[in-house]
């Protein structure tokens, strides 16, 4: 019953947040394009200069119809063109395929809410393993799934919630297998094959979700091997290593283009270059930590850490706790902190999505640390009071109270502006910057409010001869922000001399302009 109530709360919080935060980023629109379009972004997003595209063109780009439905091969081919693995997009294709020819951002949000329930389950199992208290584990897991960070990731229609869930289950299952291993003399494949297969499948699933998962997998595997080595479980160490190597080989066989993505495409090369460049050892890490602290702990993380540290030192001095008792934190902390550092340095932007896979593990480490200290109390009533206080602190420091919007206001404002402008003109124009057409993805879900879109290459500035374009009384014009608006207005005035132009809204990538024909 408690688990059902927790699940309903998580679902409700995310739905309410989804209703008050709308509009999609370009990457989210790209998730739909990758999941539902034959030919992927190369077939859909590279537009021809001086050509009309009707509303159905953009509507079809984000909906699954005909052969696009339940098409695993299409999704894999689309992602091979891009720089990400295909598993999440396969799931999104399944959802969109059920609703043939329809688009809704709730398809992606609903899928992420489903995965967030697994995040809650994985975090609950992990916490229960350490704290051995169902109420603390359930309440803490629920609060995390209702935090600003978790809601942010749920509403962001990409693969990060799925990556978070797989990371949690992989961590928890490694602990389960390790405990089983040290409780018996040997852990052969023949007798315990199910456990090796489970680790094998989780590893492949994580690698097919996001390449950053492979960084965490290497770290947790190294830690696992070290733990077995210390216990002189050499045969089990070799069996585990064999299972992981087998998973790597099968992974490459299933998705061979991963090697190209990791070592030869721009994302892989740029990640290595950014990690190695001398920009200050901790600059990016501190920036990422600030974002993490703000989104998960509302800026209270350092106060929490200082409090726990001081209590720990006090209890060590009083000989009520030993370093050995704190050792269990190493399994959670070491791979997570190293991942946090590496990805903060290597990721292209300072944004929470890249470190979200280990965010729940770091959150769990704080709770486990606090519970270790609570357990030093002698009397049960003191432990109970301290546990209640811990849950209250987590609630106020992490629970999302809707005071801060998850998505930037301009996503919603832009949609409102476009809807108003569509009343002025039935057609729109996009003037792009050479081949950087990805900058127009953000509005693929909005272009369909117009009857058609006329695409112009803003670098070529070819003569405009299209009669339909030249006959328009008003035009809604998108101009790539890489281009100078005044230069574009001068170019348009050559063919539309009686027009005046007003920039109605500016986004990161486009100026949204209303062009009106002057009377007389």
Predicted segments with their positions:
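Hydrophobic/aromatic-rich transmembrane helices and adjacent perimembrane loops
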Residues: 163, 215, 346-378
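Transmembrane-helix motifs of polytopic, lipid-linked glycan transferases
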Residues: 107-131, 169
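Membrane-embedded, lumen/periplasm-facing catalytic core of multi-pass transferases
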Residues: 393-460
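Transmembrane signal-anchor helices characteristic of membrane glycosylation enzymes that use polyprenol
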Residues: 2-62, 246-259
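Specific aromatic-rich, kink-prone transmembrane helix
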Residues: 94, 122, 142-146, 150, ...
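Interfacial juxtamembrane loops and adjacent helix segments
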Residues: 36-84, 92, 96-101
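Transmembrane-helix signature of polytopic, membrane-embedded enzymes
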Residues: 123-146
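Membrane-interface alpha helices of multi-pass inner-membrane proteins
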Residues: 140, 188-211, 222, 246
